[in-house]
Amino acid sequence: MRRHRGCINLSIPLGLLAGIGVTSMAMAADAPSVHVYNWYDYIGPNTLHDFQRDSGIQPVYDTFDSAEVLEGKLMTSRSGYDVVVASNFSLPTLIKAGALAPLPRDQLPGWKNLDTGLLAKLANNDPGNQYAVPYLWGTNGIGYNVDKVRAALGDKAPVDSWDLVFNEDNLAKLGQCGVAMLDSPSEMLPVALHYLGLPPNSTDPEDYKKAEALLLKLRPHIAYFNSSKFISDLSNGNICVAVGWSGAMLEAKTNAEQANNGVKIAYSLPKEGAPVWFDTLVLLKDAPNRPQGLAFIDYLLRPEVIAPVSDHLSYPNGNRAATPLVAEATRDNPAVYPSATAMATLYTLEPLPKATERVRTRVWSKVKNGQ
């Protein structure tokens, strides 16, 4: 999971989301339904209401807060869900387990709207794009306090490069104003490997020794590893640099602007390349309401439907036809919609063999403990 989406797991009745009263919900009890499982706070405020209004299908909408919760539910029993929002990183596991149904493109007229370049990247996790529709996506990069980084490194600070955080001289200076990184070996170690010129999805233990050596050298200058605290700390000026998700950095920037506290936050997608992640719409193999599930997926493939979702959440969508409909402030922001040049440098992360996972876990433990 590569987004800050809250920390609770709850079921949201459509009536509460859309302002529909209890009476209308009761009247809809016999209506066809679709059961949807999504990340917490990860849809437009009117999307579900409008879908029910247009289709007559009642969404039953539950949320989760981690990929582990999602995979655990889908891998251990019949979940009862029709459509699930799954990360690209989870797709190989779910496909191998036979949990997903191939998508019949002839029943998804909106498929033609998808960005073929994004589909090509997603195919690294979903070969042939058989199972997953891109919903929203983002990148992992560097969020920074413009003024404090300039004060520490001068006007020529390499804010467009991973040298900002992986060069020891730079990090030693930035450490004085606070540096944070994600507490996520599956996301941080690939970035370190890539910086060293090694495959980000390497299975070679020797490569991880090199990444370990790099991070241990930097460890004294890193304030902490955490996957949520950095958002408020960055927006409040308590730290000056964080490595994390694009949407989280935009959240920090927005929070600082709303607080009018004088903190200027920017997001950089390093020129050497960075991870790109996707959240995708998948249809479960045992979906009890398959036609309604396909109808829900195709609804989200409508440009006029997905564009407001991107505006609301500040994440780009995978729908090329929707781009002109996205608010100018969103679509022209390179932190949200990277340039074609930047897109060419992005890479996806992949699940690794269990033996490599164990190596990675040991390395990360050493790095966090500084030994």
Where are the regions that the model predicts?
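Early extracytoplasmic/lumenal segment of secretory-pathway proteins
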Residues: 28-97
